[in-house]
Design a protein with these regions (language model features):
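Primarily recognizes the serine-hydrolase "nucleophile elbow" in alpha/beta-hydrolase
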Residues: 98-160
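Short glycine-rich catalytic loops that host catalytic nucleophiles or stabilize transition states
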Residues: 189-195
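An N-terminal hydrophobic leader/cap segment in hydrolases
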Residues: 1-15, 21-27, 118, 221-236, ...
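Acidic catalytic loop of the alpha/beta-hydrolase fold
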Residues: 168-173, 196-197
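Serine-hydrolase catalytic machinery in alpha/beta-hydrolase-like enzymes
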Residues: 14-113
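Short beta-strand/loop motif that positions the catalytic acidic residue
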Residues: 158-159, 163-166, 170
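Long, low-complexity, intrinsically disordered segments
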Residues: 234-255
Length: 255
């Protein structure tokens, strides 16, 4: 029995073609349901990394159903990893994109929804972007997309709400480079003190994504230190988040 307010994910098998992937699902009542794509499978990327775990917790606490999963060949998921061990190159992601689509199908069936929000972290951001045109995805969130070494220029063509989070000290996600890839209507949040792992900024990361989910494509009501949108940046809007050092408040699930 799950008590009211208790955070308890359920282990699920996610079908991806002929193989089964390991996943963790938590039910919720608010739209949209959210699927979370983890980082690079040969660099320790799994659904249990702190960023994915924090996002699943924060989004679930806000009332949204979540599904996080492991790619083929990772953890208890069937299949094999096709990437070269030890490489930081993204390479062919067709298999991982299929895995994401399988997870989306599972989440749609579980929630009886028509669309999901697809959230990708690092390598997972490339996977989400590759599937962004799918009708089953109505908005995307990209956390620390590795724009150094991978082509994210397709971001300009995404005609759906987009939220991007950039860490100020991430050598794979240069904020200036990322700004040049954003299209009209995108929202970009910068956490200057964070690195690629967001270990000291996990609460801020979770809160920013939850706030954006609540407002959709509108600017989240956060610690906004840029009073006006940048007028020369292609129509996207940017906010800057700073660690206030204060405890993170409980989220109100009734609004």
């Amino acid at each position: 029995m799950v008590l009211e307010g208790q955070y308890l994910e359920r282990s699920v098998a996610v079908k991806s073609g002929e193989i089964a992937l390991d996943g963790l699902y938590h039910r919720g009542r608010k739209a949209p349901p959210c699927v979370l794509a983890p980082p690079h499978p040969v660099l320790g990327g799994s659904m249990t990394v702190p960023v994915i775990a924090e996002l699943a917790w924060a989004i679930t606490r806000a009332g949204h159903p979540t599904l996080r999963f492991d790619y083929r060949g990772v953890g208890a998921s069937q299949g094999t990893i096709r990437h070269q061990p030890g490489t930081e190159r993204i390479g062919d992601i067709a298999g991982e994109v299929d895995d994401l689509r399988g997870a989306i199908d599972q989440l749609l069936a579980s929630t009886r929804s028509q669309v999901v929000c697809a959230i990708g972290y690092s390598f997972g951001a490339a996977v989400v972007l590759a599937a962004a045109a799918d009708a089953s995805i109505d908005r995307i969130v990209l956390i620390a997309p590795p724009v150094i070494g991978w082509d994210f220029s397709a971001l300009r063509k995404v005609e759906k709400p987009v939220f991007v989070v950039c860490a100020g000290n991430d050598r794979h996600c240069d904020c200036e480079t990322l700004r040049g890839m954003l299209g009209k209507g995108a929202v970009m949040a910068v956490i200057p003190e964070a690195d690629a792992g967001f270990l000291r900024s996990l609460p801020h990361l979770g809160r920013s994504v939850v706030a954006w989910l609540r407002t959709g494509p509108d600017l989240p009501d956060l610690d906004d230190h840029s009073d006006e949108p940048r007028p020369d940046e292609g129509g996207f809007r940017e906010i800057e988040l700073h660690d206030s050092g204060e405890p993170v408040p409980e989220l109100d699930l009734d609004d």
